[in-house]
Amino acid sequence: MLMKKCKIVLTVLMTCLLLGNTFGSMAVNAAEASDTQAEQTIANTDEYKAFWFSYYDYTAYRAKYKKRNATTFKKYFTHAVKKGKSLGMNCIIVHVRPFGDAMYKSKYFPWSKCISGKQGKNPGYDPLKIMTQVAHANGMKIEAWINPYRVASGSTNYKKLSTKNPARKWHNKKKTRRNVLAYKGSLYYNPAKAQVRNLIVNGVKEIVENYDVDGIHMDDYFYPAFSSSNVNSAFDAKEYRASTMAKGKQNIVRFRREQVNMLVKAIHSAVKSIDPSVTFGISPAGNIDNLTSRYSYYVDINKWLNSSDYVDYICPQIYWGFKHPYAKFDRVTNRWMNAAKSKKVKVYIGIAVYRAGHNIGAGSAERREWRTDANILKKQVQYARKKGCDGFAFFDYQDLKSKKSAKAVKQLKKVLKY
């Protein structure tokens, strides 16, 4: 009887152990699944996951290869695309006009010195053609990125520009000299000139007509910043004083916003008239107060967010951490999502990979956050997804592969690639 009882007890114990292992395993698997789901937060299958390939990356290419030709450039760019793919990215935003120039054979703008070493010098191959081919061959979308108004940064010497540069040509003629303006040591196309708008729009049209791009992208270089002492007298103030808006008693702030609006609307219209499937988006500075300030940018952001006539998407550059003293990532993201409630355009969030692993930020708390928190990029993606954003763009390629940001990028991958 004792033996029988022992066998019964043993059988019960074994059964409990087996059941315990089974349910324990199920519990662990359920917990793991829950953790994975929590990490993902969860993304839509068509979520935009892009990264910027800036003019810095062309400079890095030139530094890496002594022999620079179509073969070495294709090799370099293929590495960039494959890196993005390995992290779960599905779009690359390539700089094609950083300084009133071109990374392709243009009818309007000179070759960029960022690719050939000297403005106006043909590199011997067409970078944009190679980039579109490589991106699509690897299942990745590609957008052509332009800076519309910037001609030269840190120099006002027109002789440093190519003789084929329209800015230099215009400067050489009195009639068109004000199409280009010098301000605080840099050169800009004058936003208030119709000839300038036509040039910029034509430059976009030739890209969409001649290259298999999926989108046109502009970033935050619009008007430069003014002060209370010169806001009414500097830059394009002369054009304002001669305008019907001035005569109609509308102030210079409204005038400047309207110049940018006209350009943006014209680009959107031109792109859609050529190929409705090609997108047009803008990545403005992340602080809405700065965008709507009477002293800088002159971006009519509320109009763009609440109309289908200007852009397909807005991608604010929210380049701050959760510990920023004033512009906390969560607060700024909330403000953008609230501003875009009409759902007329998509909202992507621009994220600063270049800060991860670096001692950078406003105040000791934010600097420590960027320097030590390996989950910072992942948490930003998770937070923005929870708030309903449509995707992300990460700045930039060099930082996605740098040693300093490696830990944060490794964690980022967990919420992008699955």
What are the roles of these predicted feature ranges?
Residues 167-288, 292-307, 317-320:
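Polysaccharide-binding and catalytic clefts of secreted carbohydrate-active enzymes
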Residues 306-326, 336, 343-418:
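Substrate-binding cleft of secreted/luminal carbohydrate-active enzymes
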Residues 87-123:
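Aromatic-lined carbohydrate-binding/catalytic grooves of carbohydrate-active enzymes
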Residues 75-102, 210-215, 307-314, 386-391:
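Catalytic domains of carbohydrate-active enzymes, especially glycoside hydrolases
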Residues 19-38:
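Sec-dependent signal peptide cleavage junction
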Residues 41-74, 143-144, 149-210:
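Active-site-adjacent "subsite" loops/lids of carbohydrate-active enzymes
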Residues 67-87, 114-138, 202, 258-265:
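Aromatic- and glycine-enriched glycan-recognition loops and surfaces
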Residues 56-71, 108-125, 183-198, 248-260, ...:
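The substrate-binding groove and active-site-proximal loops of carbohydrate-active enzymes
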